[in-house]
Amino acid sequence: MKSHNISRRRLIQIGGVVIAMPALIGTAAAQAKIAARIAHNEAIGSPLTQAFENWTKLLNEKSGGRIEAAHFPAGQLGSYTQNIEQNRLGAIQITTGGPDTEETLAPEIAATGGAPGFIFRDDAHVDRVLQGEIGAEVSRIARAKTGVEFVDYGEVGFRHILSKRKVTNIDEVKGLKIRVPELKVWVDFWKKVGANPTPLPYAEQYSALSTGLIDALEADVFSIKGFKWGEQAKHLTYTSHWFLPKAVRVNARWLDALPADLQKLVRDSAKQVFAEQRRQNRANAAKTLEELKASGITVYQLSDAPKWRAATESLYAEFSAKSPATKAMIDRIRGLAGS
């Protein structure tokens, strides 16, 4: 039988390594960085994209380097739908998108995403809903049903029609091939006013305008400017038909796995950054509209806004029928409209 003799010096060396191992492991753990991929489809240069850029830097700095956040705007990591799905799965830790995306999984919170149209009166109404009890409740529901926490709400403002031909009343929208998000509630809305809604991915709008697949789209002024859609369509009709809040979506499993101080940092810094984003968005909307005018876009006001509201009013009952909770949410939102 072979004998295995270990010298005294070798034994001391081995012992030293064993003793040092916990310290080495601890040092490695302390140096390990927590990846946070922030990906979305908002336009480069928009107030919302700038807010995510600011938040990325803040997370990196305030975490002392423990969080390694990286920002991927304008669809760099996939389409809107892909970003939402990857966020739910945890492959993308943070994204943004309207609560209307939850039309199927949680219709009661889709109402806070502007569904079913003309539900928000103005910015003050939006704040009463999302910065109060309803906003917090919506986040809890999203967490339970989708695995994503809404840590705050950014915004891009009210949406309007950008088209290749003039639209100033409900008769002129008849048959208009307009791009809409790939959600039933949006299709239903535009059918009610007589348009021809065409569901398409967000990133395909420029090419769809250029090829004639669509005649129009609907969006906020910042996106119209940022994605240069005005190069293909020169008529902007101020309809304010939809206000789409941009929920700041954080994967709940990722968030829960963070140390307590970093969880607090993520939530608190989001509130700080996106409060300023909302202020900036509202302060710059009029300026951005003037820039669109200067680029050659003609701006119109609806001459018959009450007819649009009347044509889509039945959507409230139809959407409310999805569940008692959905009806209750719509009633609460409308009840906060003010005088």
Name each model-derived stretch:
Residues 2-25, 31-128, 134-136, 140-339:
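N-terminal secretory/targeting leader peptides
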